[in-house]
Amino acid sequence: ILVEMNKLLCGQRCKEVLLDYSDVLGIFIPELLPCVGFSQQNVHHCYDIYTHTAYAVDAIRPEPILRWTMLLHDIGKVNTFTVDSRGQGHFYGHPRVSGDMAEEICARLRMRKRDREDIVTLIRWHDKNIPLTEKGIGTAMLALGEENFRRLLEVKRADNLAQAPEYRWVAEKIDAAEKLLDEMLRREPCLQLKDLAVNGNDLLALGYSGREIGLTLQ
């Protein structure tokens, strides 16, 4: 199933297949079915949850981890839906709920542990606000590592491109974040633990132990 799903998600006309055959996809991932036709009732969205998902998958480059992330990034929205006094829909906490559901789905499909962890991490981070500053980007880089941080920017861009046209300017902020990241890396600052001149063994030799090692490195 996983091999065929990867072919579908990374193949041509993926969006059309997702939209036309949601019932078939639901046989293998039934958690997606409640999203079909579910109105988001929010000015930022011009599509129901499932249609937004299909457009978001199509908006990101065809790499399995990225495509799976977009397929499952909002799968917990139905379970977190609320409406405020103005009639606007909200989905508070949906990244965490979606991440938990995605973890179960990916395990059921027998994905590799590393791929599963990356997908869940990206889903849990996809709605976080990352300040467009060196400190904000540095903090995210420290938590995610460069590869997943760059993936996260792609996820955020694709998510935004699948929203209402008048709110797609957010993608410009993602472009600016990528440029700032490249500038920071060109200056070769220490943005990740692996970039440090010391490691856990060095601190161990100096008498540090347990959690103290990780906290000191950070």
Predicted feature locations:
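Alpha-helical scaffolding flanking metal-ion-dependent phosphate/phosphodiester catalytic sites
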Residues: 63-66, 71-78, 137-185
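Non-catalytic alpha-helical coupling and interface elements of nucleotide-dependent molecular machines
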Residues: 10, 26, 80, 128, ...
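A glycine-rich phosphate-binding loop feature that marks nucleotide/adenosyl-phosphate handling sites
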Residues: 23, 35-38, 74, 118-126, ...
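Histidine/acidic-rich helix-loop-helix segments that form or flank divalent-metal centers
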Residues: 40-58, 111-168
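Glycine- and charge-enriched loop/helix tracts that form the active or gating conduit
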Residues: 1-71, 75-93, 97-111, 204, ...
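Histidine-centered, transition-metal-coordinating active-site segments
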Residues: 10, 14, 95, 112-113, ...
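Short glycine-/small-residue-rich flexible loop motifs, especially phosphate/cofactor-binding loops
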Residues: 18-19, 103, 120, 152, ...
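Charged substrate- and nucleic-acid-binding regions of tRNA-handling and nucleotidyl-transfer enzymes
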Residues: 104-108, 161-218
